[in-house]
Amino acid sequence: MPAPLFLSGPCEICGQKTSGRHFGVMSCRSCAAFFRRAATCSRIFGRCPNGNCKLLENGKFKCKKCRMKRCLEVGMDETKFQCNRDLISSSNKFQKRVSLIEPPPQSLSTFLGRPTLLLCCEPTRASHIKTLINVTYMVDVARDILKRDVSTKIPYQFHNSLERLALSLEEIRSREPDEKIKMLRKIGQEESLLIWEQAFLRAVEWFSNFSEFNALDELSKMTILKSAWISWTRLEKLAETADHQRKKIFGDSVMMCGNDACLDLANYEVDLTWCTNYTTEQLLFYLSPEIEQNHFLSLQELVELNPTSTELSYMLLQITLHLAGKKAQGQLLEITEMLLEAQGNHLHEYYVKKLKMPNYVMRLAKLMKINRRIESDMRDRVEKNHIARIFNILKVEFSEPDMFEST
């Protein structure tokens, strides 16, 4: 162990107790501060009549000229000054110093001119030539479904359109028995397109039982469906998955992803070669919203709340009509707000008269919280798809692009 440094003893200038080595000399803080001030200022001390004054007399230093001379004689060195280390500086010096400091280094994303999302992506893999996927047939089938007469389709008694939608949802779900659900191990082009087709047509069929919706013109109906089917599917599949988990049919990581198919999020393979030249690892951040925390949190809340078919039908209407109206604005926004107001009255009647639950505000707030979480994920997906289009991440495009902007 090295010997400790000797930092005690008298000041070599005035003889007082030293506080350490300052500017190359063992000195007290007073003499060190004096030398720093005197050596940096432009003031010239007057001539000393004695030439060799006693530095410290009655606790005071009378002659600055002799004190400065003594500092230089014992070896104080002004080249050892350390500048720009003061915690408190005058505003002028501070501004001058800041102006000389270089700006902070650029982040990697700023330097490369690419967002953090795409730092690991190779520009040579960008797809400037797109493959068109024609989904016009889905829109044509949707128009045919909406033209059908569904007035006698449901033989049960209902009092309003919300109850009719609840019965329709139960009837649609009853077509796929639990024992016929198959587990998917791989998601590729064929599986993706089939799942999207099933989801879109399922949403169309459900909306076809909405009497107020059927009264709208065809353009308004198709605009709502194109904007709403993905959010409708997200919520409906979450609710269906929660129902299966409640019955102990599914594990915690399994979810419905089609009319008769499910997917284990902890054990499946994704094939993206049909839609992009980038690898799954490069697009991991882009693909994450489907499996992130919001998804499982919403699923857990649906398991605990166990919404009825009527409550779920209102949730489906709220999230779809709200997003469709917000996107389209104008007259369609007024239409969706009018439809939601009417269904809100039906839901109030359902709580008060059928469930005998006049204080339902807290429960409804929890259900709407799930909707807001899904809406947040949808906005995130739209933004990332926009980035993907700008940087040509995907090598496919759809004949109805507004239908798939949040997939």
Swiss-Prot record:
Domain of life the protein comes from: Eukaryota
The protein's name: Nuclear hormone receptor family member nhr-134
Coiled coil: none
High-level lineage: Eukaryota, Metazoa, Ecdysozoa, Nematoda, Chromadorea
Keywords attached to this entry: DNA-binding, Metal-binding, Nucleus, Receptor, Transcription, Transcription regulation, Zinc, Zinc-finger
Purpose of the protein: Orphan nuclear receptor.
Residues in NR C4-type zinc fingers: 11-31, 47-66
Record-annotated NR LBD domain positions: 157-407
Record SUPFAM superfamilies: Glucocorticoid receptor-like (DNA-binding domain), Nuclear receptor ligand-binding domain
InterPro entries named in the record: C.elegans_Orphan_NR (IPR051152), HNF4-like_DBD (IPR049636), NHR-like_dom_sf (IPR035500), Nucl_hrmn_rcpt_lig-bd (IPR000536), Znf_hrmn_rcpt (IPR001628), Znf_NHR/GATA (IPR013088)
Origin species: Caenorhabditis elegans
GO cellular component: nucleus
Record's subcellular location: Nucleus
Molecular functions (GO terms): DNA-binding transcription factor activity; RNA polymerase II cis-regulatory region sequence-specific DNA binding; zinc ion binding
SMART domains found in the cross-reference section: HOLI, ZnF_C4
Keyword Acetylation: no
Similarity comment: Belongs to the nuclear hormone receptor family.
CDD domains, per the entry: NR_DBD_HNF4A
Pfam families per record: Hormone_recep (PF00104), zf-C4 (PF00105)
